[in-house]
Structures are given as C-alpha cells and as structure tokens.
C-alpha cells in the first residue's frame, strides 16, 4: 500500500469520459463512520480548485495511489441513495452501451431535495404495507407464470380485450395481468417493478393495482412528477419492502431490497428508447437487471417486438399466450376491393363507412390516423410537387380550416408561395391529419359527436355513448366496454416511411388499437394487404415477426446483429475504427459525410463481441477526450480535439 488510512472510492458526477472511473479520496477524521458506500459527498478536483459532487461507491483502508490523497470536502447527506445493486446495474448498463456510469446514475438517482430528505431521516423507514394473498393470473393456462419465482424470462401475449374492474372503471386486459402478477409477487414478500411507456398506460395500471394491492404498497416513480414528489417516491423505495414500483423507463433503476419481478408493457413503444446518453433502451436495462438480480422478467404486449422474438428463438425467453377464446375481429378491407375500383382509391372504403354508421348508432367508433394536425403536408395543385419553405426548405402544412400554409420546421408563413418546378401558386392538401379527418367525418355523419385525441388534445377515457373518435397512434382513449367499431386508416402511408422498423411498428400500433374494441366489434384495416394484414387478421403476429427476423438475419440487420454508430471528425472516426481492425469479426459501413461536416460510420457485430467492441470504442472516446491540440496561430492556448461520439443500438439509424 502506498498510502494508509480511511479511503473512499468515489464516482464523480461528471460527463467527461476520462473521469468515468473510481477515484480515491482520504476520509477526514471528522467524517469517519459517516462516509459509507452510497452517500453523496463533495470532493476537490486537481484542476482549477473546483469542487465536484460524487457518490461513494467503496470504502476501505489504504490505497494503491502513490501520492498524497486529497480529502473529501463535505458529506452532502448521510442518507444512502446509491445501493450496491443499482451501482452494479449502472456500471453494467454503461459498459454495454459504451457510455459513462455517471450518465446512467443521473437517470437512476433523482436530484436531491433537502426537505424531503430531512423528513425521511427524522421519521425513519415507512411501516410495512398490509399483507396480500396470491390469486393467480386470469386468462392464461394454468402454471403459465409458475417459473417467475425462480427467475424465468417470459414473452407474454396480452389479453386483447377491455376489462371492467370492481370499481366500475375499464382498463386494458394487460393492466389486469400486470396487477395480478404484482400482487402475487407481493404475496411472496418480494418487490415488483412495472414499467410502462407513458402516463396513459400508468393511469390504467394504477387503477388495476388499486383493485388488488393496498395503496401503501404502491409507489409511483416517473418523470412527470415534480422534483420533491419524485425524490420522496425514490426515498420510499430505499425502505424495506415489499412494494410495487410503477413508472416509465427510468423506473427500471429503482432501488429494491428484494426484487422478485420486472415487467415491461409494450416494449416496442418509442418512449422506451432513452434519449439521453448512453441511450440504453428500457428493454436492455430490464434484461441486464434481471440477469443480475435473478428476478422474474415479463415482456408483455399485444404483439411482441422483433427483439423479443429473437429472445424467444434463441431460448432466452419463453413465450406465453392467453387462452384463445377471445381475440379482435379484424377485417382487412383490401380483400374486398377487387369488385369496386372506387373503393380501391378511397381513403375510407364503403364497407368501412357502413360498419362505422352501424356501430355509431349504439356507441363510440375509433378512427386511427397516421398524423396529427389538419394537413401536415401540402403540394403544388398543378404538378403535385411537395411544397417547401423558401427559408429553410421545410415542409409546408395547413394547421386549421382556412388557415394559411406555414413551415413545419421554422414556422414561417408562406404568404407568396410559388412552385419551384412549374411556378404555379395554388396549393392542394396532400396528407390529411386528425383535424381534417374529423372535419370530413363530421360532414359525413351530421349530428354525430366528433372527438379529436392527439398529443396536443389528450383524452384518456370515454363513456359508452355514440361518438366518432379520431385519434393518432398511441393517443387513443379508452372507451367504457370497448369501441363498437375501429377503423385503421392511412396504413399505406404508415408503411411508406423509410425505416427498418416500419412494418413491426405499424403492426404494434394496429394491434394496440384493435385491443380497444369490445369483443366481436369489427376492426377494419384499410389499404393494407399481404402477410402483414393476414398476421393482424388472424392475430398471429408472432409468425410475421418470425419471418421478419429470418430476413434480417440473412441481411445482418438488427436485432440479428448489434450496431455501433461512430461519428465525429474524420480523423477521430478513423482512429476509433482502427482500434477494431485487429480481426475481421465485424463489418464497417462508411464512413459517410454528414451535413455538419463530420462523418459517420456504422459497425455491425455479433452479440458475442458486444463487450469487446463497446470497450474498444469507449477507450477511443477517452483517448479523444484527453487529447489537446495547440492552434498554430495562438501560442500557449489549447483547445479540445473534435468530439468523437459513439452510440450503440440506435433504433433509428437504419
């Protein structure tokens, strides 16, 4: 040992990649016994006399550091907020994503609120919630979930019908399934973490939990909470359980003293993709935590994702399907077009009109559309060229009836627009959004109540009364008892998007909308045929996804392989790629130039090489960050090298 005495190993709260490691600090005599693993401290940095926040990860006697250690400046709080399990999870997630552990901890540990913390320290741990009894999971064959207590990983198909709770509220069958699984986990004396995409799903799940689990046993932890409220919920998770923790993607980092269940609803929802570095998807976080904790894992959805299908195929997860007694009645209208050319050209074919009119006599009808707004895209009335802004070349659109076209990017009103191709000045509506669709339906069904639901106008629930509900994907309200008919419009437009995931994304959103229909109600898929329509109509989405995975495996597309995106200065990207060139077990696409002058390369590699590729690219990022260049015109001054950016498993890169 080079130095003896009490030593704390800390992780600085810093985004700098070169500081993504444990640093040794001496523990002053006055703080001995108080500085323990998991507390927040403040420590001095060697440069500039600055003080940084940090988490204590380890404590001990002595250090291998050759010189004198700096001492801890301040104990921020005696409350242990970073548990060993969450630290191990953050480190593992960061390493897998070629990122920094401090970035993960910003997602895992909320910002401190002093008053909340003082109240918790004064009051002590909260009393345990009343015990509950296990009751099993309805709608599935017996023993479908028996292996969860031993750490089974299950890919579960949801019961695709609305369910009425004892309280009178209606929720999706999936919410009842998760609530029953959570109740049985509590009955075994263990914690359950339930992750859902957004507040709409969370509201349903909390209603289902309220019918089965004591309120004291449920903790809500999500990004919509105010700072103090969220920190208070987080602190509750530090107390001994058992409890159920419900929230969005960050809830997967919630501390737990005895984790028994991790469950995700609808893991293909884009909201489960983390927008902050290191961009670890919620599904990957759940898989890592399940492996570390030995808890049971449930990936639940009306249709599974291609990523989950891969887990099933390699035997890592076991598929569980509900009893086939009830499934949505889906009718692809493309099969009816051969006899009517006018229907083939119509946005809403006559068969869909008839079903909507019939259903509207008795209850609500859902019309799902691709885009919000009135007319998100307009074009030249003469030559059909898409109209673009004269300032930034963004797409022009109309936001209300009689409104003037404006740019969707910069907001500039196109007062004197002229077509760049034919010089015409007249515009026509091309892409119809929810607003324009609602307007047209209102004219087609005079006297009918028309409701628009989208991101700007959220609607959560509806009574079982006649109404036309025009909703964008993911914003569909729940109707008491279920919709009397569902129309899925703009299918061709959804599939026209250039993306590797476009078909499975469409299948997921259609399946979720179909599950909102009451049993036996018609669900009409407009304008889509082939294997995709057949998969939805027969409710055998897994067969389509199985074939999709086989095609991607042949083409070496995700999730058959993993991807790393390397971008930045051309020289920095070249150096990073050189670090991988010691063997031929990966494939590099590019580099290609980007609009900002940087370049980007894509690296394809097998899962078995994931740890090695992530570590090598992380080392390249650290080398790039620690390098300094002296501008030739300014002696004595330094500037950082061009930034090198690495992202693994970007869902939108292909």
Please give the residue ranges for each predicted region:
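Arginine-glycine-biased low-complexity disordered regions
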Residues: 562, 569-573, 587-615
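Short, solvent-exposed loop/turn elements at beta->coil junctions and helix N-caps
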Residues: 12-13, 251, 456-459, 590-594
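Accessory, non-ATPase domains that flank or precede helicase/AAA+ motor cores in DNA-metabolism machines
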Residues: 1-331, 338-341, 358-361, 477, ...
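Inter-lobe coupling/hinge segments of SF2-like helicase ATPases
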Residues: 153-186, 190-221, 228-231, 238, ...
């Amino acid at each position: 040992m080079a130095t003896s005495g009490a030593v704390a190993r800390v992780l600085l709260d810093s985004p700098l990649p070169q500081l993504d490691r444990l640093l040794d600090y001496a523990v002053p005599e006055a703080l001995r016994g108080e500085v323990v693993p998991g507390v927040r401290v403040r420590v001095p940095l060697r440069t500039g006399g600055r003080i940084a926040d940090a988490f204590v990860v380890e404590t001990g006697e002595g250090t291998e550091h050759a010189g004198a250690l700096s001492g801890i400046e301040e104990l921020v709080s005696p409350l242990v907020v970073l548990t060993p399990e969450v630290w191990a999870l953050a480190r593992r997630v960061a390493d897998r994503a070629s990122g920094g552990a401090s970035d993960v901890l910003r997602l895992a540990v909320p910002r401190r609120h002093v008053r909340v913390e003082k109240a918790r320290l004064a009051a002590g741990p909260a009393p345990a919630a009343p015990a509950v009894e296990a009751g099993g999971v309805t709608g599935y064959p017996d023993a479908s979930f028996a292996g969860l207590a031993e750490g089974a990983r299950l890919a579960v198909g949801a019961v695709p019908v609305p369910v009425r709770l004892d309280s009178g509220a209606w929720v999706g069958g999936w919410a009842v399934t998760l609530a029953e699984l959570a109740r049985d986990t509590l009955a075994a004396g263990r914690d359950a973490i339930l992750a859902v995409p957004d507040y709409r799903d969370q509201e349903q799940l909390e209603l289902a939990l309220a019918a089965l689990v004591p309120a004291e046993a449920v903790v809500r932890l999500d990004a919509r909470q105010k700072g103090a409220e969220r920190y208070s919920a987080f602190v509750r998770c530090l107390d001994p359980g058992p409890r159920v923790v419900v929230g969005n993607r960050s809830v997967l980092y919630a501390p737990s003293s005895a984790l028994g269940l991790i469950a995700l609803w609808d893991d293909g929802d884009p909201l489960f993709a983390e927008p902050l570095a290191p961009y670890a998807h919620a599904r990957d976080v759940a898989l890592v935590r399940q492996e570390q904790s030995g808890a049971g894992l449930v990936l639940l959805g009306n249709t599974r994702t291609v990523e989950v299908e891969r887990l099933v195929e390699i035997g890592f997860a076991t598929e569980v399907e509900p009893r086939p007694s009830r499934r949505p009645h889906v009718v692809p209208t493309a099969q009816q077009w051969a006899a009517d050319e006018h229907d083939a050209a119509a946005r809403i074919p006559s068969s869909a009109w008839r079903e909507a009119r019939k259903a509207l006599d008795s209850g609500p009808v859902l019309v799902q559309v691709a885009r919000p707004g009135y007319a998100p895209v307009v074009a030249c009335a003469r030559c059909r060229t898409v109209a673009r802004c004269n300032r930034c070349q963004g797409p022009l659109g109309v936001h209300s009836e009689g409104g003037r076209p404006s740019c969707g990017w910069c907001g500039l009103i196109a007062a004197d627009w002229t077509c760049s191709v034919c010089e015409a000045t007249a515009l026509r509506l091309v892409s119809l959004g929810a607003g324009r669709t609602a307007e047209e339906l209102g004219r087609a069904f005079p006297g009918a109540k028309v409701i628009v639901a989208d991101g700007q106008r959220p609607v959560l629930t509806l009574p079982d009364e006649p109404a036309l509900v025009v909703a964008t994907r993911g914003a569909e309200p729940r109707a008491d008892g279920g919709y009397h008919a569902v129309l899925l419009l703009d299918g061709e437009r959804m599939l026209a998007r250039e993306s590797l995931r476009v078909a499975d994304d469409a299948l997921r959103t259609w399946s979720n909308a179909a599950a909102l229909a009451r049993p036996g109600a018609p669900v009409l898929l407009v304008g889509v045929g082939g294997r995709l329509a057949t998969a939805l109509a027969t409710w055998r989405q897994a067969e389509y996804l199985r074939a999709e995975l086989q095609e991607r495996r042949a083409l070496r597309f995700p999730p058959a392989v993993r991807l790393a995106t390397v971008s930045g200065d051309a020289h920095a990207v070249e150096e990073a790629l050189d670090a991988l060139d010691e063997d031929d077990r990966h494939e590099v696409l590019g580099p290609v130039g980007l609009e900002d002058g940087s370049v980007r390369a894509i690296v394809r590699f097998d899962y078995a090489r994931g740890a090695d590729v992530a570590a090598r690219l992380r080392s390249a990022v650290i080398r790039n960050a620690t390098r300094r260049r002296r501008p030739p015109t300014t002696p004595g001054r330094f500037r950082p090298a061009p930034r090198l950016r690495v992202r693994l498993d970007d869902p939108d890169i292909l």
